[in-house]
């Protein structure tokens, strides 16, 4: 292994250890929430825009993965029509409402909202819709970055 590879690996491992140390309780809470929902017939819906939506895509239909994971797919929130358009649309009112309306998400389900900052209109709107419908949410974001955004 080269010096550069060892250095990179060491840095990544230290970051992962820090995240696990700081967030382990939250990870366990989320796992329990998802498990409880699944046992009641619920699904884990995953919402994100731009690159954040890729986590939902990655979790879907994976061998050995969680079968009840369902990405919220909306071409307007992808880069399919261009990055500039997707970036503008994630800041547009009612865009999350439009995307979520395609799915029958109920109070027995979980909505995971993925966002690098948590401040753009679409993830905030998704969270407010979920709250109104009494859908439990999990937020995956960078709190540090969201405080700077």
How would you label these PLM feature ranges?
Residues 4, 19-22, 26, 51, ...:
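Catalytic cores of large soluble enzymes that bind and process phosphate-bearing ligands
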Residues 16-26, 111-120:
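Short, glycine-rich nucleotide/cofactor-binding loops
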Residues 22-38:
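A short, well-structured juxtamembrane/interface segment
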């Amino acid at each position: 292994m080269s010096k550069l590879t060892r250095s990179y690996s060491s840095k990544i491992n230290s970051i992962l250890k820090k995240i696990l140390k700081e967030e382990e309780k939250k990870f366990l809470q989320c796992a329990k929430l998802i498990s409880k929902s699944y046992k009641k017939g619920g699904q884990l819906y995953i919402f994100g825009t731009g690159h954040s939506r890729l986590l939902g895509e990655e979790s879907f239909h994976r061998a050995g993965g969680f079968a009840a994971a369902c990405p919220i797919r909306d071409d307007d929130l992808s880069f399919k029509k261009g990055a500039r358009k997707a970036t503008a649309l994630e800041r547009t009112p009612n865009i999350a409402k439009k995307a979520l309306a395609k799915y029958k998400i109920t109070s027995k389900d979980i909505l995971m909202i993925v966002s690098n900052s948590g401040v753009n209109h679409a993830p905030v709107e998704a969270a407010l819709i979920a709250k109104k419908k009494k859908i439990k949410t999990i937020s995956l974001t960078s709190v540090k970055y969201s405080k700077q955004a």
